[in-house]
Amino acid sequence: MKVHCKTLQRIIEITTLHNDFKRLSENKCKFNKLFYYIELYYNQFMLNTIIIQPPLVQLNTPYPSGAYLSSFFKTVYKDYKIQGTVKWLDLSTELFHEIFCRNGLSLIFEKSKKKALKLADNLESQGDDNSAFQLRRYVSQSKNWCNWIDSIVAIVCGSHNLSGREFTHEFVRSAHAPRGARMENYLSKLTRDVGVDDSQILASLALADLADYITAAYDENFALIRYAERLATSEVSFSETMKGLDSPVLTDFYKPLLLRKISDLQGQNLFCISVPFPGTFTAALQSAGEIKALYGENCTVAFGGGYINTELRNVSEQRLFEFCDFLSYDKGYGSYLKLLEEYSKSETGIKKLLDGSQIYNVKYCLDGKIIQPLERDEELENAERQFVKNLIPDFSDIDFSRSPRLADDANPMHRIWNDGAWLKTYMAYGCYWHRCAFCDTSLDYVKNFCSVNQKSYFEGIYNQAQNKGVYGIHFVDEACPPVGLQQFALQNLTASKTMPKLTFWGNVRFEKTFSRDLADLLSYGGLTAVSAGIEIATGNGLDSVNKGIDMENIVSACCAFKEAGILVHSYMIYGFWNQTEQDLINSMETLRQLFAAGLLDSAFWHKFTLTLHSTVYQEWLDGKHQDLQPVPAPKTQFAENDIHWKGENKSQKYADGLNSALELWMHGEKLKKPVESYFQFRMPKPSIPQDFVDKLIEKYEKKRDSAFCEKPAAEKKYVWIGGKPVLLKSSGGIQLCWSYMGELLYADVQKEKSCEIIKLLEKIEAENFDSENVSFTGKELNSVLGEKLFKSLRGKGLCALI
């Protein structure tokens, strides 16, 4: 590379020295022709990397893989002195704006109105008058929808050209504003007059209503979050998946968008297409096909991401490699590092490196033969771990003002998912538990746990927040390590002395480490919500799925979080292969009690799916779980992950009852209704006590209070989060006064030590934490505060660290 760059530099020098500039200026044709050839010569040694997120993923914030890959490639380009640009294109958000605008809706209504009216006639003849009415109303209101759509979008996301705030008053009240079924359902349930505060929810529901119309009358594969998801599951052949390439949304909207974004690239181009979910795979194929048609031999296309890692682990479908040149498994860093290292030495195209040799975590096809990946490479594995520890996701290519903040539910935990432009990131790759029976524990993204370098990570992610003006962090870890969360909160508090504080939330495990002390500190340090798996809320159920925690741990963690003002969401499983009906109803009853006690804000029921990479299936292969009976499936060359098993459909009948009850509980309704009454068939009564959760809460409170009454541990570290204490005179002497969680609290102190106490508490504020400073130790605190005052402050601003 260096030789070619020097050669180019020499050509330019010779041109400058041996030509008279004035003469060249007079003959522009020769001048331009010379530099045209110089540019051609230079371009053949450039390598551009374009990271593409095809639609559709969560709209309010970009999927994080692009941020990590962007940072990775920029680092490697610098290290290997590779010439070219690195660009990340979030085409999911861009497609949203292509569709939901005046021109987009006009095109959709024009192409779909005949089909919509015909469909309405058919539905009416079948007795579905409501659906027929809705379709006819969309067609009738099409001009109104087109007139309003830009204002509706402006309400849910920032816009450089249009402020949505002023339209909220008219939108929520006008009899002439467009309405759909979801909007009207929301309005009908209001027990008050509609106001401008409802505008964001109504605008979000308006988009959902339009999405319903698009799915019904224009493109059956369309959904606001996933596109053509059913076309890429383990149940579908590659031929059937390819049929989705002719879908209207892809041909009318996505193809023109893609070509606009990529049509002006020069030199060699590496396209890294992220496929996190089945619902992005069809658009990934469309992207690859258009790229190949446009750039031919000047491009190399790679697929990677969650869907590739799970569903296409064993793929042997050669037609797939007509779209992509190779599949990159797992993190991707090692495989790309190897390819770029070889590229920097040889300066041949990336594609020429796919010569039949095995490459770490890369699968490709050469001359009709699938070349399997090299599964182990110690040097590259170590390099990957270093990237995991040190990479800072790079969001510089993202315009967060274009991200819609959708708010289609009043539930606060549901709102946090969609209502905010979060920087999605992780503080640890993989899961530190990685033993759950249902989880893909044999895959890299679960089993290979590795934490980030906490100090440099916080500094880097804070820099990203400042650059983009987005101070919300969503940790997408499999489960955030408690120690990592504590350290992040302390770093956040230190930064907050001079700069805005980050607000953050993420996935955790409901374990005993999350004490009231830790929850208080995390809440004070910016944690606003957690999500975690309970799965099966019974002792037997937790043991069956090998969760590694019990109901006492779960209730304890939930109590601590809720007392600290942190939102809590839980994932639930039904239909586990050996779950009994009694165990299911007991789990449902425990969930009801958790909601009734105010320990959960939201939850979600998942139907158990047996997967190829799960612990329970691997154990079955080893001769365990003989009652589990996987159904032999025909060999497939395409997607392979979900495994059918005898009896799997028996649990489907429970879905409606579980979900209808949960929907009520999440909105504080019907919390005393017997759980068995939600089903249209006979169910056993729960066999757990009605006060099961209440008893566990009592146990938590006793342990919490006992911990607050313990003597200070000499080497343990403590921090103060009780604000600025003041001294007051009282009839008995001197009192320490401070505010904590909205309460004004008092404690008697010795007059001669009062100033020293104030100084110590200010010194050990969490914002000042220094792990090397002895002032934060129990020994130092005890010497200044004394045991009595120490205990008076515990749980009221004085937090013990883990």
Map each language-model feature to its residues:
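Glycine-rich beta-alpha loop elements in corrinoid/cobalamin-binding modules
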Residues: 56-59, 64-65, 69-105, 116-119, ...
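N-terminal [4Fe-4S]-dependent radical SAM core
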Residues: 369-424, 743-745, 796-802
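Flexible glycine/acidic-rich beta-alpha junction loops that bind and position SAM and/or redox cofactors
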Residues: 88-99, 308-317, 540-545, 574-582, ...
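Structural recognition of alpha->loop->beta junctions
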Residues: 317-338, 521-529, 586-610
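Short, positively charged and aromatic/hydrophobic N-terminal segments
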Residues: 11, 16, 30-42
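Canonical Radical SAM [4Fe-4S] cluster-binding loop centered on the CxxxCxxC motif
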Residues: 417-455
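Radical SAM enzyme core and accessory elements
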Residues: 26, 35-36, 43, 47-54, ...
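Conserved SAM/AdoMet-binding glycine-rich loop
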Residues: 49-57, 298-302, 458-567, 576
